[in-house]
C-alpha cells in the first residue's frame, strides 16, 4: 500500500466521501484536483495536466484552477452533468499545527445551482425526487433552490412520473438506493439527467410548517428525502424553503410527453430550442419571474372554468386599457428577479448590489399598485391588494446600503454614513488621521527646511517620512528613526507618526470589520421578509404573464374564447399561431372547425403536404391557449373544457429506445385509447402508415370504431386510406372533411382549405408531371394505377362496418405486380422503383426536388 504525504492522504480521505463528484481541494489561491479527478477534469476543462510528489513511488496527476475564477470552471462541469464538491481551508494556515484542516462546504450538483450562467433568467432549475411505494404509487416532489418553489403530489403510475419529469424539465433526480435498476435505466435513457441517491426520509427539525402542510405519510417521506439531500449537499439551512404546495395532476389538463413534443409547446422538435414553439410566441413577459411562470402555466392548462375566465377577463381588461398596460410594462421592466434575490438572501450569498436591486424593485411597487388598482376588474383589485411594498424593508435598505457598493462584502464602502455611530467614529478617525498626516507633512517641511520631504505609505512599512540623501544633514538629531534605505533617499518614522498610524490603521481595520458585521445583520433582517418577498414575486409574475397575453392577443388579433356547456366546439377562421407568425397573417389560410355531440370525429383526407397536420395542431393549440387564459387565433371560438389532449403527429423514430415509427405510433395510440374520456381531445395523423397497407388500414379502422363507440372523445383523424371515408355511412358521429386542392391549367394548387366531404382523388401523379418526368413514364404510371385500382376492387373487402375498397392516397400504390413492370424498359423500371421508394411523409420539398432530379437523370 502506497504511503502518501499528509496532505494527499487528507485529500483521499475527503474524496472517499464524495466518490461521484469532482473534489475542488483548496490549496492557497488554487483549487487543485488529483488522481483520476485531475485526468478527467483536464480533459473536460481543457486545462494543463501536471503532477506532483505525493509521497509514493509515482508522481500524482494534478491540475488546478485559480479560486477567483473557479466559478466558470464549476459551471462547465455542472452543465455536463457532473457534481463538484468545494473543499475549503477551515483554519488559518499560520496557526495550523500540521496539515491545515479542510472540509467540504458545499456539493454543487445540476439540480442545486444557485448562481452563475447555469441559471437562465426565464427557466427554472428543478431538482426532483421520486419515491416508489409498495402499492405501486409514486411520491413526486420538486424544488427550485434558487427561488424556493416547492411542489409535491402523489402519482398513480410510472407514466405519470415520466410526464411530470418532462413537464418540469428537471436537471437532477433524487431516488432511493433501492430504486429498481430497470427504472433507473429508463430515467437515464428518457431524460439526460443526473441520478442521485438519498435514503433518509424523515423531515428534519425546523420545518414545522411543511410537516403541517403534508398530511399524508407518503408525502412526508417524499419531501423528507428531498430536504435531506438538499441539507446534505448544501451544508446549510435554507430559510426560503418553509412552504410546499400540494397539487393534484387531475386539477390540470393532462398533456402527455409525446403530445407536448408533437405540439411543440415549449421547444421545437428539430432544434430543441424555444424559437418556433408556442412558448416563444406567447412570451412578451418583461421580468424573469414572469417568463418562468408563463412556462409553468403552459405546462399545466387549467380545468376550472372560473379560474380560466378570471384570467381571460383580466387579459381583456388590459387589452382595452392600452396606456395603462404600457405603463405597467415599463414599471415591470424596472423590477429585478425578486424571487431569486430572496433565494440568495436565504442562501447567504447575497451581496450589497443584490440588496440595491431588491430596493429598486420594491420602489416600483407603489406605482404598480396604483396602475392595477385603477383597472375596472375584480381580479385586478385582488392582485393590487397583494402588491406588498414592504415599506419598512425599503427604508432599511435606503438608510443602510450605499447606492453603488463594491461586489465584495469584505472590503468596506458598503454602509452609508449616519447608519451606525461607531462606524462613523472609525471613519472620522480614518479621514481626520489622513488630514492630520497631510498637515504633518507641511509642518515637517517647515521645521527642516526640506521642501522635497514627503510622507508616504506602503503595506510593508506603513507610514514613513522620506528624505533625499542630499538633504539628510538638515534633519534634527534624535527625532527621526530610520526605517528603510533607498538608492537616493532614506525613510524615517517619528514617535508621533507611529502613534497616529496605529490609530488610523486600527480605525480602517475596525471600520471594515464593523461594516461586514453590519451587512450580515442587515442580511439577517432582510431574511425576515422572505415569505412576503416570495408572495410579492408571485403576484408580479402573474401580472407579467397576463400583460404578455394581452400584448400578444392585441398584436395578433386574437379573440376571447367562450366556453360551451354542451361540449360544442366552434372555431371560425382559426389559425395556427406559430405558423401564422412565421408566414405572416396575409399569407396564412384560416380554417373553421365545428364539432358537437352528433359530430365527434372528423376524418380528414387530402394530399400530402396540403396542411392536414397543421390544421390538427392549430385546433389543439387553440384549446390549450384558451385553458391557460389567453385569447386565441380565430375570429370566434366556443370551446368545451378538455381534460386531456392526445396527439400522434409526426414520424420520428424513437432512436434512444430503439423503437420503430410504427411501435411509437402504437404506444401513443394506446396511451390515448386507454386514458381518454369523452371530455378529451385526440389528434391522430396517418395512423397505420408504418406497416403494410392492410394491417395499417385494419388498425386505423379499428381505432376509429373504438373511439367512436367506446370513448366519444372529440377526435381529428387524418388518413391516406381513402377507403375509410365510407365509415361516415356506418358511424353516426363521424364526418368527412378534406383539404381542398384544384387543378388549374394542368397544374395542382393546394388551397390549404378544409371543406366538407372526402377528398375525391390523389394528386401524386400530377406532382410527378410538375417535375417534368418523361411523358411516357407518366402515361405508364396512369395505366398501372388504373390496373391496380381494378385489382384492388377484386380483392377481399374490409370486414365489419366499412365496405369500401382499398385505395391509397399516395404517389403510387404500394404493391405492384411484377408482370406490369415487365412492360417497362430497364431505365423506366429503375426510375419507377426510385419514385416508389420516396416516402413523401418524411421528405422535405427540397429533398423531393433533389430526388426527382435524380430520377430525370436516370431517364436521359
From Swiss-Prot:
ATP binds at residues 606-613. InterPro entries: DNA_mismatch_repair_MutS, DNA_mismatch_repair_MutS-lik_N, DNA_mismatch_repair_MutS/MSH, DNA_mismatch_repair_MutS_C, DNA_mismatch_repair_MutS_clamp, DNA_mismatch_repair_MutS_core, DNA_mismatch_repair_MutS_N, DNA_mismatch_repair_MutS_sf. Gene3D superfamilies: 1.10.1420.10, DNA repair protein MutS, domain I (3.40.1170.10), MutS, connector domain (3.30.420.110), P-loop containing nucleotide triphosphate hydrolases (3.40.50.300). GO terms for biological process: mismatch repair. Pfam families: MutS_I, MutS_II, MutS_III, MutS_IV, MutS_V. One of its GO terms (cellular component) is cytosol. One of its GO terms (molecular function) is ATP-dependent DNA damage sensor activity. Keywords: ATP-binding, DNA damage, DNA repair, DNA-binding, Nucleotide-binding. The keyword Lipid metabolism does not apply. This protein is involved in the repair of mismatches in DNA. It is possible that it carries out the mismatch recognition step. This protein has a weak ATPase activity. Belongs to the DNA mismatch repair MutS family. This is DNA mismatch repair protein MutS. The gene is mutS.
